[in-house]
UniProtKB/Swiss-Prot annotation:
Protein's job: Attaches a formyl group to the free amino group of methionyl-tRNA(fMet). The formyl group appears to play a dual role in the initiator identity of N-formylmethionyl-tRNA by promoting its recognition by IF2 and preventing the misappropriation of this tRNA by the elongation apparatus.
CDD domains given in the database record: FMT_core_Met-tRNA-FMT_N, Met_tRNA_FMT_C
HAMAP family tied to this protein: Formyl_trans (MF_00182)
Catalytic activity, EC: 2.1.2.9
UniProt similarity note: Belongs to the Fmt family.
Protein name as it appears in the record: Methionyl-tRNA formyltransferase
Transmembrane segments: none
InterPro entries hit by this protein: Fmt, Formyl_trans_C, Formyl_trans_C_sf, Formyl_transf_N, Formyl_transf_N_sf, Formyl_transferase-like_C_sf, GART_AS, Met-tRNA-FMT_C
Amino acid sequence: MSLRVVYLGTPQFAATVLKTLLDAHTHIVGVVTRADKPQKRSSKLISSPVKQLALSKNIPLLQPIKTTDPAFLAQLREWQADVFIVVAYGVILKQELLDIPTYGCYNLHAGLLPAYRGAAPIQRCIMDGGVLSGNTVIRMDAGMDTGDIANVNYVAIGEDMTAGGLAEALAASGGELLLKTLQEIEAGTVRHVPQNEAMATLAPKLTKEEGGIHWDAPASQVYAHIRGVSPAPGAWTRYLSQGKEARRLGVLSARMESFSGNYGDPGEVLGVSGEDLLIACRQGALRLRMVQPEGKASMKAKDFFNGQSRLVSKLF
């Protein structure tokens, strides 16, 4: 492939896709990623996974503070790219930048557009109980995920799949979809289909508070919520400690109880069942497997319960 490609991306998802392109000998003439960020509880700067991969391959790298900076835009022009590929870069790009490459900018979106436009298509699809996701490649315009569709693929959402697991599956197949798109661009056969605006939905970035579990819902819905916010921002609930103080409890993993009948009041702690802690929902129940009490390390849910002298009777 002779196309000159500039790649814009930041997290591990984008690094996985970039590796697929590099393994296929795509001509990546430059990489753009977000500026290094301080590590939590430390002043040490952390490089993005995309930066680490680009440096390991000796690919020219830019980390602009602002993508509207004239010096940055001038450097992009010097790379004389035929196409820009954007994957989870993390910044909405202005039209001046989008107009630089000969054939435009193409974005790999981890969702089936026009549904789930925004920063959290993977998480919100699972939280909504979705059973099918996929990648969409669009030719970018100045809107948020509103460009014409060039290619789509599909990935089934397993009944126990978390957002982290779906992200891995979408990244693995997304690189191949981009390779197909680049080949079509080079051959002049790529199609651009406008999105159906009537079908558009939004998927804004999740907040930590949205990880809160509402037990007054069917177990299937609660389980979808937990899977959708795993690993980030993470599911959580509250309990009354022995001193009757409300504390937060992170829920790291869970599974559905097979019987779907009524067990008790929503959030009621039904006790230890095997290795799990059984919690009643409005309909059915969930088995909590791994939890993380506030300010403590992760542990088995049954060990948490036993450590509280089995005095925790309800989660809320």
